[in-house]
């Protein structure tokens, strides 16, 4: 029963915060939950592969401007001539490294997920952020926890 209340609260917050992504995600999870035979099969698969599917969809969206010719090699070369371009490259590298550790942390330490979900909901709903942050947040958490020699137990 608690999970229904929690999911309902997330839906309400998403609705009040006008966050369609979180609203759709919550609704999908609830619809799957309504059918136990579905949830037994789908939840483990979505939990195990969902982040990778999401990254794939984001990657496809990022590559579309290249496919349509909106971004060409000259744009890449011009970007690399600027400090902002180099900062973008470094940030891309850092996010990839953080995300790697974030995925590992989410897999090995499920209890951190609750805190990350709360932080993500607050960031998305109240600060108009984007819910792509849990993996990166988990990566940052991994580094801070390691740096400060902390644990989750």
From Swiss-Prot:
The keyword Amino-acid biosynthesis does not apply. The keyword Membrane applies. It is found in: Cell membrane. It is a multi-pass membrane protein. GO terms for cellular component: plasma membrane. The chain crosses the membrane at residues 4-24, 26-46, 51-71, 86-106, 116-136. InterPro entries: UPF0756_TM. Keywords: Cell membrane, Membrane, Transmembrane, Transmembrane helix. Belongs to the UPF0756 family. This is UPF0756 membrane protein LSL_0936.
């Amino acid at each position: 029963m608690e999970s229904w209340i929690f999911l309902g609260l997330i839906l309400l917050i998403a609705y009040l915060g006008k966050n369609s992504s979180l609203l759709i995600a919550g609704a999908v999870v609830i619809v799957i939950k309504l059918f136990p035979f579905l949830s037994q099969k789908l939840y483990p698969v979505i939990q195990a592969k969902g982040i990778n599917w999401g990254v794939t969809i984001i990657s496809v969206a990022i590559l579309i401007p290249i496919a349509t010719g909106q971004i060409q090699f000259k744009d890449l070369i011009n970007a690399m001539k600027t400090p902002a371009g180099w900062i973008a490259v470094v940030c891309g590298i850092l996010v990839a490294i953080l995300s790697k550790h974030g995925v590992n942390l989410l897999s090995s330490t499920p209890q951190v997920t609750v805190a990350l979900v709360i932080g993500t909901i607050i960031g998305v709903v109240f600060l108009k952020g984007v819910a792509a942050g849990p993996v990166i947040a988990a990566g940052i958490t991994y580094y801070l926890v390691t740096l400060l020699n902390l644990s989750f137990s």
